[in-house]
């Protein structure tokens, strides 16, 4: 299922939300309508938590996470950290990191198994990332852009890349991530994919300007038409067994 939403008339909803398979963070402030869209789709399966990071509402660009953990920049306050620890499932590890590239969501893209990171990301951050999120880490660019977290979105089912990504890069990234990838846009032609949408294994949210053509590409590559939460555990088990055999 792919749903359209906006945050205070802003269609860059990927800036104001962070969605994974075990939790969803939504920025404080904004209209109730924005939360109700997320809560309507998610509240029966995962917690939808109001949060800020370092006093900012652009939480989607500030943090990076998956079902195993959440990484936030060092300027996240103790109160914000405690609130997230209290609100998220106990299985989710939350870690503050000292990183020069502090908008972690712009420089890291990940699913539950693999992370793509900015070529200049600190080595220590890379190690923490691999440990906290339990992912394999690759330094990459997308369409020659270093902000890998901004120019793609991917789940354990598929991924959407910057429209100028070459076929060779698509094939390389697809083999690293082990999921099908396509190039595309959101919000009627925006190349900044991750700012315009958030996605997990059964649900996607896109900016209100996203066209029906863009939505159908998203529903197709992320396999959302036949996905619902109860099938996720089964498919996760299958993929885990595949990776072990």
UniProtKB/Swiss-Prot annotation:
<dbReference type="GO" id="GO:0000460">
    <property type="term" value="P:maturation of 5.8S rRNA"/>
</dbReference>
<comment type="similarity">
    <text>Belongs to the eIF-6 family.</text>
</comment>
<dbReference type="InterPro" id="IPR002769">
    <property type="entry name" value="eIF6"/>
</dbReference>
<dbReference type="GO" id="GO:1902626">
    <property type="term" value="P:assembly of large subunit precursor of preribosome"/>
</dbReference>
<comment type="subunit">
    <text>Monomer. Associates with the 60S ribosomal subunit.</text>
</comment>
<dbReference type="GO" id="GO:0043023">
    <property type="term" value="F:ribosomal large subunit binding"/>
</dbReference>
<dbReference type="GO" id="GO:0005730">
    <property type="term" value="C:nucleolus"/>
</dbReference>
<dbReference type="GO" id="GO:0000470">
    <property type="term" value="P:maturation of LSU-rRNA"/>
</dbReference>
<dbReference type="Pfam" id="PF01912">
    <property type="entry name" value="eIF-6"/>
</dbReference>
<dbReference type="GO" id="GO:0005634">
    <property type="term" value="C:nucleus"/>
</dbReference>
<keyword id="KW-0396">Initiation factor</keyword>
<dbReference type="GO" id="GO:0000054">
    <property type="term" value="P:ribosomal subunit export from nucleus"/>
</dbReference>
<dbReference type="GO" id="GO:0042256">
    <property type="term" value="P:cytosolic ribosome assembly"/>
</dbReference>
<dbReference type="GO" id="GO:0003743">
    <property type="term" value="F:translation initiation factor activity"/>
</dbReference>
<keyword id="KW-0690">Ribosome biogenesis</keyword>
<comment type="function">
    <text>Binds to the 60S ribosomal subunit and prevents its association with the 40S ribosomal subunit to form the 80S initiation complex in the cytoplasm. May also be involved in ribosome biogenesis.</text>
</comment>
<protein>
    <recommendedName>
        <fullName>Eukaryotic translation initiation factor 6</fullName>
    </recommendedName>
</protein>
<keyword id="KW-0963">Cytoplasm</keyword>
<dbReference type="GO" id="GO:0005829">
    <property type="term" value="C:cytosol"/>
</dbReference>
<keyword id="KW-0539">Nucleus</keyword>
<keyword id="KW-0648">Protein biosynthesis</keyword>
